[in-house]
A protein has these predicted regions:
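C-terminal PAP-associated
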Residues: 1-414
Length: 414
């Protein structure tokens, strides 16, 4: 594993608007980067040599509520795509998720479309969106998000898709949507290249009660979503305790939501954080690889260690078809950012068993004051290097609070 670039984002890049629940996202073009996190956005036209800070609270109007948290960025063709989540204007009202696009990524260059729950169903006027993600197919940009009621209880998950061709045009952006009340926190698969995940968007969710993955497919050419339940090895969704020699805690928010997913050829992969079990003394990453034509599980390359916890995996294929990961490892229980790739993939009969080869990028000097970390990080295929990826994460440097968060952008390759 080769770390080609390791960029630490300073205060000028983030406006010191950082948080320990950092939720970083990154997108890359051939020459530029766009990075977001709680609660900043920043653009580099020269792969990190310089940065322009964009304040998510003021860059776009707060006419339908104040910016809250949760941002996702993607590169779609020649456009930077920036998704921002806003707070409800008043208690008991809708919030919005705002989809913004720009050809330059610079301040004051954006146009946008807003989406509220009641834009999908008129009677959804007292619920709110949370925990979004974006995926890409040949023809669509896909949003997955949860919906909660005024008492913060989960109600449903929603998948929305927009035609990619509409992103380049002014005016209304048509959408289709699908919803389920049986699976939440749906994670879309990542693909590589201009076509993204190809002609079908797959997405997945965990069901610990049946030791299953809920797997869904929405073809570009169809208005309908098909779903399956795929049995995998069991895991624990509660025991995320892991206090090491350095003391402290950073997994108080950990759960078993799928945080990484990919599609390579006919293989689908999903990864999530599991609590510890008898033969694995620390929380670890569960991973299942599925054949999309048979829905058989063909490999379960978990990532675990006898010396510390692994959590918050993000997955993406490279353009060459290798699968990359970014995740956090608790070395002495201090969260460290690590990246790596899956060897022995795709799995072959009689071949090597798929396994993760990981490298540590940066180690924290402290744990967060309140034990809160996560909820996700990001890895993307590098746009011009076929065997490389771009990842975004964060560590704590020199203290325990949000001002000590140091976001990082990493380019790595096999």
């Amino acid at each position: 594993m080769r770390i080609r670039t390791d960029l630490a984002l300073g205060d000028a890049a983030t406006g010191i608007q950082t948080g320990t629940v950092s939720e970083p996202s990154v997108a890359a073009s051939g020459s530029g980067l766009f990075v977001t996190g709680n609660w900043y956005a920043t653009h580099s036209p020269d792969m990190g040599a310089s940065w322009e800070f964009l304040d998510p609270f003021t860059e776009l109007p707060a006419d339908r509520g104040r910016f809250g948290c949760d941002q996702v960025v993607l590169r779609v063709g020649r456009l930077w795509v920036w998704l921002l989540q806003y707070e409800p204007p008043r208690a008991g009202q809708n919030n919005i998720q705002r989809l913004a696009v720009s050809s330059t990524g610079r301040p004051r260059s954006w146009r946008w479309w807003d989406l509220a729950p009641s834009d999908l169903v008129r009677s959804w006027d007292k619920v709110w969106f949370d925990f979004p993600d974006l995926g890409l197919t040949r023809r669509h940009l896909v949003l997955t998000t949860n919906v909660y009621d005024a008492s913060d209880r989960w109600v449903r998950a929603v998948v929305v898709r927009w035609p990619r061709a509409g992103l380049t045009k002014a005016g209304p952006l048509p959408h289709e949507y699908w919803t389920t009340t049986t699976a939440g926190s749906l994670r879309p698969v990542a693909g590589a290249g201009a076509g993204g995940a190809g002609d079908t968007m797959w997405f997945g969710s965990t069901d610990v009660s049946s030791s299953s993955l809920r797997v869904f497919a929405w073809p570009d050419s169809s208005p309908s979503v098909t779903q399956w339940s795929v049995r995998v090895s069991p895991w624990d969704d509660s025991d995320y305790d892991s206090v090491g020699p350095a003391g402290g805690e950073w997994l108080s928010r950990a759960d078993d939501r799928v945080t990484g997913a990919f599609r390579v050829g006919s293989r689908l992969g999903f990864a999530w954080s599991s609590g510890r079990r008898a033969d694995r003394p620390h929380p670890f990453v569960r991973c299942a690889v599925i054949d999309e034509s048979t829905l058989d599980v063909v490999a379960e390359p978990d990532l675990w260690s006898a010396t510390g916890p692994w959590a918050y995996p993000a997955l993406a294929p490279s353009v060459s078809g290798r699968v990359g990961m970014a995740a956090y490892f608790g070395e002495r229980n201090l969260p460290a950012l690590a990246v790596g790739a899956l060897s022995g993939f795709p799995p072959r009969s009689g071949g090597a068993v798929p396994a993760w080869e990981m490298a540590t990028v940066a180690r924290s000097t402290h744990t967060p004051t309140d034990g809160k970390w996560g909820d996700y990080l990001t890895v993307r295929p590098h746009p011009s290097r076929r065997t490389s990826w771009v990842a975004a994460g964060a560590t704590l440097q020199g203290g325990t609070n949000r001002r000590n968060i140091e976001p990082r952008v990493v380019v790595f390759s096999t």
